[in-house]
Amino acid sequence: MPIVFVHGVNNRDGEAYRENEAGRNGFLREIVAPALGLKPDKLRIFSPYWGKFGVEFAWNMAVLPNPGDGFESFGGNAESEALGRVVGLLAESQATGHVVVDAQQDFPATVDLLYASAMAGAKSEDEARDLARSYMLCAEYADKNPQPDWVATATPDNFADQLNYVAEASQEESFGAGGILDSLKEGLSRLVNAAPDATTALAGSLLRKKLNTTVTRFAGDAFVYLARRGTKDAPGAIVKTVLDALRNAQAARTADDDKLVVIAHSFGGEIMYDILTHFDPTIQLDGLITVGSQVGLFEEMKLYLASRPNLPPDPPAGHIARPPSVARWFNVFDTNDVLSYRLEPVVNGVSDFHYDTGFSSLSAHGGYFMRPSFYKRMAARLSGG
């Protein structure tokens, strides 16, 4: 089952983009693929990168408020970036970052938080895959033991060791403690270090600037796409990049593995809808998952090439039809994500699902694929659960 991941706005090539891709691919292989009856190494993943054709700012967004302050960051190296993501994870959330206290309140949620923190620093797909396998063991243990006795006497120094020990002791298979335990301890360290920063004015300022930048680039990427998407005979660069990946994924189908699934984040959903309704309606999808997307909003504004002002004739009671080439369509949103929208009120044959990323409104839009539990839920939906 080839999977095509279509990224959204505000993605530009660099270390953070490549680390996010590696982490995402690792969790898709180790959590989603087995649920679909595939061996992890057999899963073909296509990730068309269209960000290079997105908006460019002549003055580097100098029009944003307080440009003289510069764009503060948590640091230029990878670990500082990972810590910044964890600060965003904790800011305005119910978690405190004090892992033992959090575990005593909600052990399964704390396990997910710990692995999200570890995943934030994954540097390769292999490391992400190891984390994903370990997460599945620990998540299963947490589901069966939501209030384990050992948490009452655990300390921040031994929490990761005890979690790793009890999770593996409950399974016949062990994935090895060495590298995983180190990654978990790094994740726990990020939580401890991020906890004080998550409540400071500096964190709020940084996250607001991040949101401001995201919204600005969202508008810019959207305007560029709409102005340059091209025609069916001469598609623009963004459409062509995604279309080529879809056709390559179609060609990768075999008689024994003939399914094709597309995961589209944010504006990737709008690109996919234009492709499926205008540029190439012949592309057959067994599953389409739009995440934090605005597909319904853009149809309400009638901005697609296939949009018709008189269809449906009786909104809001009426709906438009799901593209016939899509067998199943799941639309995932977080009420904290200010850039995510429902789709059921506009399109027939679509299932809306709410997912709580655990992030505040300042960071939720990019948070879905940072949470290990998101892949677990996705696997369950795709496998019919």
Question: For each of these PLM feature ranges, what is it?
Answer:
Residues M1-D102, H354-G366, M370-G385:
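Conserved, well-structured beta-alpha core segment at the onset of a catalytic domain
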Residues P2-E30, P67, A219-W329:
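Serine-dependent carboxylesterase/thioesterase catalytic core
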Residues E15, P40, W50-G54, N66-G68, ...:
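Lipolytic serine-hydrolase domain surface
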Residues L43, L260, V350:
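Short, conserved active-site loop motifs that form the nucleotide-linked donor/cofactor pocket
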Residues S47-K209:
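Non-catalytic, alpha-helical, charged scaffold/linker segments
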Residues T200, T213-R217, F223-V224, D337, ...:
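Flexible, active-site-adjacent loop/turn segments at secondary-structure boundaries
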Residues T200-G220, T231-G236:
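Anion-binding catalytic surfaces of enzymes that hydrolyze or transfer phosphate/sulfate esters
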